[in-house]
């Protein structure tokens, strides 16, 4: 009978503890679906999009001529002139800035709108990373809960076998009722851990739903197993090419270049062209020397007006300010590029470190599985103690926790690289 129980315990140990390496994907990985949902529903991303649209409207409204001016003068009492009496004057005047001023204005507004677009992109991409961060943290907690439940079941099986051994006539010298009490105390620790992790999982699910901007108790479809993601072939050129922060700084630099050109154009003269039409009545008493044929004749008068930008202090200050902004933006671009490259190099090292840790914990878990099988046999034979079994179970739980944390960390490192190359960029779908 003891051999039968020993065989059952070994089989249960193998099935339960090696189940952590078994993949069961009855539910689809819906992470991509949740990322899209967050991008569409998140208020911060929506706010950035509306800000971008507002700047696009500003760009469309700029770069056009000012409205023409219409003037109308009516004389209740006709004004005597040399060739008649003036009763009405109508004039139209159109202002024209210096050549290229309107184009520079529109270019500046368009580049500012592009900078706002890149800022909106960056917010959406950062949100997708936050979704993945909470997703993998939640999966790691689910894995830890599964491991603890499995180990608790194993502990209960050991307890039942020990109880039978204690009551049977085949009880060995090492069989003690105190071991049953120690197992019950250990089981209470397991129950507390399970309750604690369940509370953490509940809070993480609520936070995840709030991140998606939906009711906090909404159902979340999670895969059954947390699997390590394959590390991509990392290229710095992809980061430099696609990162929205760098593109935003480039757009800002182009906007300040256009602003400098605009300041220069404002320092040039502007002019206005117009025409004036005068309505005259005949003068019954024309002045001496007046031409009779022109008495009471209406007249057209072309007009031109030119501004003289003689006060240069404002223009020079605006141009200098634009030059300083260009210099500051270029330095910010180099600083951001260096920071991203530093992050890129560190990311490669962290991925290698995470993969080594996963391999280490997998190896240790396999060894501890075999150790537990041997300890159970030795305990029944009286050559090992319950302390050894409990200590090995604690080490097993600790290694399983570390492995799940390392797998989640590796997945997050991959997600961080995807964030740097803007993989989850849904701006084109808006």
Residue ranges, per PLM feature:
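Acidic, low-complexity, intrinsically disordered peripheral segments
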Residues: 22-24, 402-430
